[in-house]
Amino acid sequence: MLEPMSEGLQLHRTTLDNGMRVVVNPDATSPGVAVNIWYQVGSADEEVGRFGFAHLFEHLMFSGTTSGIASSEHLATVESVGGSANASTSFDRTNYYETVPAGALELALWLEAERLAHLAVTEENLATQREVVKEEKRQRYDNTPYGDLLDLLLDGRFGETHPYGHPTIGSVPDLDAACLDDVTAFHSTWYRPDNAVLVISGCVEADEGLVLAEKYLGAAPTATGDLPTRIQGPV
């Protein structure tokens, strides 16, 4: 059952049987609807020697599924109905979103459900996205004036061993050293329903949002075992 969180904002929340939390924000003034799924994992959760894995997975999540969605088809499918999609990585979370016409809400939820349950983590996809991330680092940091400033600030403020002591873009040596077993383990550890929050906002009724969330994301298998303790550092 949906429970209202705030009468003013019309926020409603529930938890699916597999542990995924759902928030629905009906807004009749919106012509479309946004789907935003937040995974509670970011660069602060990376172990030493694995710097850049959280951001790498932001890219891998667009690389297709074992259920038949081809690489780059996720984005192309959303754009074909007049929508947009993107993702971002921070210290404490990674999020993925689609903004689509109201009639395409089920499509967006289906796409998110497919890559949660059937992501194609393959040698080919790993090699491709590793090079994409390295090129992004070259463009945004290595070949930019003062591009190393963030790295220096984080290291100076927090220290190299602190969870916030390195930028989300990651380390090229760590990315080069990553093998398929490493990234598969990262995925199975963090990308699970009970470590995610699904937000649906826009032209959608609260009950409709719950039914569709249950239909698509509720079908993702319940993860086994406990979530790992997130890395802590001194404030």
Could you describe each region identified by the protein language model?
Residues 2-3, 160, 164, 168, ...:
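An aromatic/glycine/proline-enriched structural segment found at the starts
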Residues 49, 53, 70, 74, ...:
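Stable alpha-helical elements in mature extracytoplasmic
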Residues 2-31:
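N- or domain-start disorder-to-order transition segments that initiate the globular core
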Residues 63-67, 99-132:
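M16/insulysin-pitrilysin zinc metalloprotease superfamily fold
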Residues 64-65, 108, 140-193, 213-216:
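Scaffold signal of the M16-like zinc-metallopeptidase fold and its non-catalytic homologs
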Residues 79, 120-138, 205, 224-235:
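Acidic/histidine-enriched alpha-helical segments
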Residues 34-99, 165-169:
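M16/MPP (pitrilysin/insulinase) zinc-metallopeptidase core fold and M16-derived inactive scaffolds
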